[in-house]
Amino acid sequence: MNVENAIAYVQARGNAIERARLGAILWNEPPPDAVLQDLAAHQKPDGGFGYWAREVSNICDTAFVLQWCDDLKLYRGPIPDPACRFLLDRQQKDGGWDEVEAIRALNLPEWMMPGRIETRVWLTAYCAHVLIRFGRAEKEGTRCPTDFLLAHCDETGRLVGYLRATWIALSMLALYPGWDSEPFRKAVAVVEASYSPDWEGSYLAWLLRCLQDAGLPVDHPLVARCLADLERNQQRDGSWESEDGERYAASATVEALRVLRGYGRI
C-alpha cells in the first residue's frame, strides 16, 4: 500500500469537499470556509440535502452528507444540527425510517424507493448509525430503531433485503441490545459468512467504517481480513475503486484512508 500515492490522487482528482475530508482525517485540519459555504449552499431550508436526488431533500442523501460532516469533525453547528433534525423529524413511530414520498417521481435506484421494506430496513440502519455518531440515536416518543430492525431479520440474524443493511446496523446493535448480545453476534457472523475479498474498495471501506464504529477491534478476524483485502485492492494510481464508478474514486480513496487511519494502519 502506498499512502503517498493515495494522498496525491485525492489532492489531484478530488473536489474541495473530498480534499477537506482528507485533511480533517489525516491531519485534523479544520474545513476551509469555502467548503462550509458550499455545504450550506446545498442544504435545503428544511435542513435536508439532495445529492443523488438534487431536486428534493431526502433521507438517504441527508445521512450521506452527515457522514461527510463526521469526516470533517463537524458534530454541532448550522449544518449538522438541522440535518440531524431533518432525520429525527422523519423517524416513524415504529422506530424505522422510509424515504420521502417525493422520490417516487424521480428516476432513481430501487434502493431509494419508498414503501419497500428493503428500503426501510437499510435506511433505518443507516440513519441510526449516522445519528449515533452525532449523539442522537432516536427521536423522543418513538421506539428504538433496534425494535424495527430486529422485527425484520431472519433466524440467522440477517436483516431483510440488502446485505449491507446488516453491517450498517452493527453500530445500533452494539449500542442496544449491546456488543455481547445475540443479535449483534449473529449480525457479525452473517457478514463474515457473506464476505467477499473481491468487493470494490469503497464497499470494503464502508464495511470497515461500520465495524470500527461498532467497536470491533483491529485484531477481530473479520476486521483483519477486510483491512488486508482493502490494502491489497489499492490501484496503481493510488486510488481505490468505487462501486459507483470512476467518478467517485477520489471519495472512495478518502473513505479507505479514513478506516486505515482509524485502525492504525497509517
Range-by-range predicted roles:
Residues M1-I266:
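Preference for long, amphipathic alpha-helical scaffolds in soluble/luminal domains
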